[in-house]
């Protein structure tokens, strides 16, 4: 089982799925109920493809599995120069917490025994810096953490019961998040009662050696990480031979490893992966749900609600074709469908801004002039 697919606004792989508006657009709807519908549709499509692949038996070896998603991104967007800003729900911790909470609930479902999928909120914590993003140190007061950076994660863990969480690349107050016992043991396990499993961001454990310069070698990284409570590595450089060496040299105990393995395997058990498929009602979701008309209509409605009008000189919008003779559409992005970070292959046919305007204008024979460059 390969942990780690993406479902930020639709499933990324394998195959075609319904693509919904980018995360920052989902937040712009200000509609938590709608976001629950979106993530429920996403998890339905995951189960549909899972059944199509004979519950994983026909899946390509080494490919990301369909039932564990590294979503949503509930970091605070403080600087638009940060490349992952579109993955977030914006700069407000309350809105992000509410939207993130509903997204987690929709992904995981409400069955008393089984999870529909595993949701993994990320990146914990204080991760919103582009410069030296893999090794920077966020110096934070307790108040800044508790009032601004942590509330969105708390909602996802405490209220929505997310069963996994991803640690961030950066350090907080001098300690890389990968091994930050304050965040892992005090906040997550202690204050919030988190009982799921904790995964690193990709390559983060080895970067404690090469980028943070926090430990001397991979053996030390493995020792520090497993003892801090990191259950799963995204990658295969540290929790492999280095961890085995650390165990053989009595740097880590069998209990350390067993505890991590227990939490990871518990997540798979909650998905029903060790049970007869017929016992899990989510396994009855048919592949026909993928890209179905209902989901395409939901994507369209979400796109409509996600729109933000920044400027409207002389009340030009909405377009009144009785008063307009020609329309100029300027900019290369108007003729190109850009779905955003972590986009899958769309089952639904994309419509660009230019295509939409042309289709609307042709009703009244209004000329549309397109200039990709000015």
Model-found features: residue ranges?
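Glycoside hydrolase catalytic-domain context in secreted enzymes
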Residues: 1-374
